[in-house]
């Protein structure tokens, strides 16, 4: 059985926003496969969609509807991992802003998902967690 495909915000936004410079490339890469937002990327993608420049910004309900329609059920971090999150992060020596990338990677790892990204900086954290990373190009 093929592992689920998870995407982070760096893939979700160009997939959803037609005027994004990477839209065509990401849509071609995606090829209409079922994909799920992963961990913190769900909230982050919603945040970006609702704070884009005025002519592109979505109303909150429109953003929620778009995320529900375009993506499979989100892959979220288990309560067990969340309960021990500081210790888990410390074991991987993850600090600062990389914590948010780790939330995405930990959720992907728990669901045995491939994690698609376009973010070279986050990729290092994802790989540190041990998730299988795919570069969406």
Swiss-Prot record:
One Pfam family per UniProt: PIN
EC number: 3.1.-.-
Residues the record lists as binding Mg(2+): 8, 101
Domain PINc: 7-125
Annotated compartments: Secreted
InterPro entries (UniProt xref): PIN-like_dom_sf (IPR029060), PIN_dom (IPR002716), VapC_family (IPR022907)
Tagged with keyword Metal-binding: yes
GO molecular function: magnesium ion binding; RNA nuclease activity
Keywords: Hydrolase, Magnesium, Metal-binding, Nuclease, Secreted, Toxin-antitoxin system
Cofactor: Mg(2+)
Gene3D superfamilies found in the cross-reference section: 5'-nuclease (3.40.50.1010)
CDD domains recorded: PIN_MtVapC27-VapC40_like
Keyword Nuclease assigned: yes
Gene Ontology cellular-component terms listed: extracellular region
Record function comment: Probably the toxic component of a type II toxin-antitoxin (TA) system. An RNase. Its cognate antitoxin is VapB27.
Known partners and oligomeric status: Interacts with cognate antitoxin VapB27.
Protein family (similarity comment): Belongs to the PINc/VapC protein family.
Protein name: Ribonuclease VapC27
Native source species: Mycobacterium tuberculosis (strain ATCC 25618 / H37Rv)
């Amino acid at each position: 059985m093929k592992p689920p495909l998870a995407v982070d915000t760096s893939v979700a936004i160009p997939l959803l926003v037609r005027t994004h410079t990477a839209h065509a490339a990401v849509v071609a890469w995606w090829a209409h496969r079922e994909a799920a937002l992963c961990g913190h990327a769900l909230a982050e993608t919603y945040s970006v969609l609702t704070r884009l420049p005025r002519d592109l910004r979505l109303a909150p309900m429109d953003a929620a509807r778009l995320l529900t329609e375009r993506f499979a059920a989100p892959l979220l971090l288990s309560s067990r991992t969340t309960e021990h999150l500081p210790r888990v992060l410390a074991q991987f020596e993850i600090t600062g802003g990389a914590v948010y990338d780790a939330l995405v990677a930990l959720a992907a790892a728990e669901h045995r998902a491939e994690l698609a990204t376009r973010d070279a900086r986050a990729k290092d954290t994802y790989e540190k967690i041990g998730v299988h990373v795919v570069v969406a190009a």
